[in-house]
Amino acid sequence: MSSLTDKTRNGALKRNLLRQMLKASVFKFGEFQLKSGQISPIYIDLRECFGHPGLLMLISEAISKQVEISEVQYAGVLGIPYAALPYASVAAGNYLKKPLLIVRKEAKSYGTKKLIEGLYQPNDRLILIEDVVTTGGSILDVVKVLHTENLVASDVFCILDREQGGRQKLQDAGVTLHSLLDMQTVLTFLYSTGAIGDEQWHGIVQALNLPYTSPTKLEINSELENLSSLPYVENVRTPLAERESLTESALIKKILGIMRRKKSNLCLAVDYTTVEQCLQMIELAGPFVLAIKLHADAITDFNEEFTRKLTTMANDMDFIIFEDRKFGDTGNTNLLQLTGAQKIANWADVVTVHAVQGSDSIAGVFRKLAKDPTYRLSGVLLIAQLSTKGSLTALEGYTETAVKIANENRDVISGFITQTRVSACSDLLNWTPGVNLDAKSDSAGQQWRGVDEAIEVQQNDIIIVGRGVTSSSEPVQQLKRYRQIAWDALTRSDDSI
């Protein structure tokens, strides 16, 4: 039931699922006879979801997430006929990327006359997907059919466990039930949102012989939650000292070392257009920040003397130089831009790169420069998410692909520009823009949130702050303020600090 209140992507997904199910009239109240013959005052009609494509996709995503969390090894996905087939089809094809199998209730009298349809080999292990589990009888019938073809099925994933003996019956037969929802969660949600009252709650519990004595009311917002604003992974963040000892990246070791020495996970975005403005702000910020972020192509009088002073200041004040160039071209063009007029590779420690160009264009060129001691450049940050409203990084699959590219090239990719933690790899750092303690948005589509949300809820490591400091009449005070709040948020549960 913690999923009704926890601040995780998986929890938000379940809450959104229940909200949409309620809106789609999935929960029906009256007098209904179940397949088992039992009379129930509530009927949960998951077939209603078929008429709502968004809800069908959401359920399939949620089931797929349950499969991933379970870490069960399997070769294919089988939907229990027939109500679970749409969910199994979407989950297998769109999320799990595994073959779909179907068991017929009876073999055809023509054609191949097969009872089991799909791609499989003898002794393959399958996972089963069901919509509602009451007694578990339908699942065990399918398991018996699979055994006749030497197929193994010991795990079933369902949308709803009605908590009426099915789990135990399946367990006795060697089948583990993984449920997305159970009746306690459903009833708590319905009660908390006012869909049912005390009398209905007690009537349902009594009729279905559920082991609850009194309803629980939780504070549950009725609005849908933005799933992309929550971490993609839910494992506990590794302590900084351990991350520093585990990583093989020289840049990440350097960054984590600076963070621990200066007690700072603050990156300042110095978005000025003249060298003088930049140097003045960097002089003030240097003692308090982990990194200084620049847009070199926005500086109208950019010159080599500026980069000489910049690197000297970085060495003296112990900070990283971060050029936010957002490279996104072919490998050869990237190389020309890195070593061309502004000689970015000579003075920047790290640069940003779009994932759109693909792994080959990123890894080859940037690895070559990062391994060459004649250049200062030693790593890249891959753009996984942006903080602007309507960003195309929110398109399905973009962030996941960026994470895959980074995971496979951790010697040169040191982390992400992101809104939330997107990778389970502890040696990839999550840098997040869009942080402001005093404003929520501007007129150009920029959206901001607070430090605690960015660090503790969304599990980012480093905050990137710009106008919250640079537009202030007291920038040093703001630097101290952001540094302290961000560091406290990052290290609150870190025993290594």
Curated annotation (Swiss-Prot):
Binding residue positions for orotidine 5'-phosphate: 293, 326, 329, 333, 387, 446-448, 466-467
UniProt note on tissues of expression: Expressed in intestine and in neurons near the nerve ring and rectum.
Catalytic activity, reaction form: orotidine 5'-phosphate + diphosphate = orotate + 5-phospho-alpha-D-ribose 1-diphosphate; orotidine 5'-phosphate + H(+) = UMP + CO2
Record key words, sorted: Cytoplasm, Decarboxylase, Glycosyltransferase, Lyase, Multifunctional enzyme, Pyrimidine biosynthesis, Transferase
Location within or outside the cell: Cytoplasm
InterPro entries found in the cross-reference section: Aldolase_TIM, OMPdecase, OMPdeCOase_dom, OPRT, Or_phspho_trans_dom, PRibTrfase_dom, PRTase-like, RibuloseP-bd_barrel
Record region (OMPdecase): 233-496
EC nos: 2.4.2.10, 4.1.1.23
Active-site residues per Swiss-Prot or TrEMBL entry: 324, 326, 329
UniProt note: phenotype after gene disruption: 56 percent of embryos fail to hatch and are arrested at various stages between the bean stage and the four-fold stage. 30 percent of L1 larvae fail to reach adulthood. Embryos from the bean stage through to hatching have abnormally enlarged gut granules which fail to acidify. Their size and number decreases at the L1 larval stage. Normal gut granules in L2 larvae and adults. Lysosomes in intestinal cells are mislocalized. 7 percent of embryos lack attachment of the anterior pharynx to the buccal cavity. Exposure to hypertonic conditions reduces the number of vacuoles in mutant larvae.
Family: In the N-terminal section; belongs to the purine/pyrimidine phosphoribosyltransferase family.
Protein's name according to its UniProt entry: Uridine 5'-monophosphate synthase
Species this protein is from: Caenorhabditis elegans
